[in-house]
């Protein structure tokens, strides 16, 4: 495919990804894994569309690369816009205010727009810092340190520790019933994963993952929202966001490092990493800085999880699994100073999508 045509296709699919991320991010209950599963299930339809618009891009390699750029742009945009319904929907009552998320706490004092703007700022900083740690992470996980391979034998013990720590976090005030319920949920989730991934189902991954992710990420959120009693949202104050501070940078770095951990450690999600980190903090950070951390975690995880695919040939997220399937054979990042061309395009798509989505999300929240 000629370079001008490919650049045009790259920009088109990146912008389509941003638009899709806006739609899914603003829709409560939708997850980017739903989009990933849907793209895999409808790949042939996408290929026909690309061939009709860009006849020179009919080969499977170009189609897969454009769809991967679309998916990562959607993931980055979704990570930013997902904070809008997270903050403004399901507002708690006064009786439950102390147990709510930091975004809701800011909403209850009239600073909901500020919460979204801070998360968007964290998303931009997280993307920038993720690019900074990219090469050091490559040197750490692959040669010469080869930490990913060395850590593999310790994975079972690590997962046992993570599960135990998460269960312990539910034992506040000796509420052992909470621990029992959490253990039951973890057991059911494990059995479901074994049945789907190791079972004898004749269905391909694209067909199985879409209803699975819809049930895990979509329907429960909608049912919980319908069953919850929302409180009144107070009048919101629209104030200009303060200038970038050292606390913002420090919070974004903390979030990026957490995202880097999530991107390669097996079985560790962003929520689990945040829970484990909170168990070790002597003095928790305030809600404003926590929103910056969350924004940085979301976008850095999205970017670095795909980069890790090229480093160690293992996918740690739904989007990374889809990218590996779309690219058919993502090349290994063998030379630390020579980044694979396909990875560079994916990084550019992610960075461009974040740069577009962050100011839009902050404006929509107003």
Where are these regions (language model features)?
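Short, non-helical or kinked segments that cap or interrupt transmembrane helices
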Residues: 26-38, 87-99, 268-273, 284-295, ...
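Helix-loop-helix hairpins and the membrane-proximal interhelical loops
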Residues: 1-62, 144-148, 199-281
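Extracellular loop-to-transmembrane helix junctions
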Residues: 54-81
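Membrane-embedded alpha-helical segments of transport systems
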Residues: 72-81, 118-133, 291-308, 348-352
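Membrane-interface alpha-helices at helix entry/exit sites of multi-pass transporters
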Residues: 50-53, 65, 102-123, 282-296
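Membrane-embedded alpha-helical modules
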Residues: 118-227, 331-366
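Membrane-interface interhelical connector segments
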Residues: 310-339
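Transmembrane alpha-helix interface/packing and boundary motifs in multi-pass membrane proteins
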Residues: 17-32, 77-89, 166-170, 256-266, ...
């Amino acid at each position: 495919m000629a370079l001008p045509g490919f650049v045009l296709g790259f920009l088109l699919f990146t912008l389509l990804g941003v638009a899709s991320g806006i739609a899914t991010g603003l829709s409560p209950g939708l997850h980017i894994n739903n989009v990933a599963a849907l793209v895999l299930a409808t790949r042939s339809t996408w290929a026909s569309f690309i061939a009709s618009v860009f006849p020179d891009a009919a080969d499977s390699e170009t189609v897969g690369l454009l769809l991967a750029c679309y998916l990562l742009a959607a993931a980055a945009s979704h990570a930013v816009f997902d904070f809008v319904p997270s903050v403004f929907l399901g507002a708690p009552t006064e009786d439950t205010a102390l147990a709510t998320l930091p975004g809701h706490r800011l909403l209850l004092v009239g600073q909901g727009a500020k919460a979204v703007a801070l998360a968007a700022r964290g998303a931009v900083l997280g993307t920038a810092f993720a690019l900074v740690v990219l090469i050091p992470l490559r040197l750490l996980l692959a040669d010469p340190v080869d930490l990913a391979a060395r850590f593999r034998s310790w994975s079972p013990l690590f997962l046992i520790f993570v599960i135990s720590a998460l269960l312990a976090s539910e034992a506040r005030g000796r509420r052992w019933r909470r621990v029992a319920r959490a253990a039951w949920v973890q057991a059911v989730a494990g059995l479901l994963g074994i049945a789907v991934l190791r079972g004898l189902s004749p269905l391909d991954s694209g067909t199985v993952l879409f209803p699975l992710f819809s049930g895990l990420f979509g329907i429960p959120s909608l049912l919980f929202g319908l069953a919850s009693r929302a409180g009144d949202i107070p009048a919101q104050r629209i104030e200009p966001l303060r200038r970038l501070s050292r606390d913002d940078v420090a919070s974004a770095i903390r979030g990026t490092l957490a995202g880097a951990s999530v991107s390669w450690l097996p079985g560790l999600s962003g929520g689990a990493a945040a829970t484990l980190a909170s168990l070790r903090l002597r003095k928790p950070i305030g809600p404003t800085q926590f929103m910056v951390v969350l924004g940085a975690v979301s976008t850095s995880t999205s970017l670095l999880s795909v980069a890790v695919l090229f480093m160690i040939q293992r996918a740690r997220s739904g989007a990374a699994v889809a990218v590996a399937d779309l690219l058919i054979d993502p090349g290994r990042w063998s030379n630390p100073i020579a980044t694979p061309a396909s990875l560079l395009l994916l990084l550019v798509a992610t960075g461009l999508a974040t740069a577009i989505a962050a100011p839009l999300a902050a404006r929509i929240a107003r």
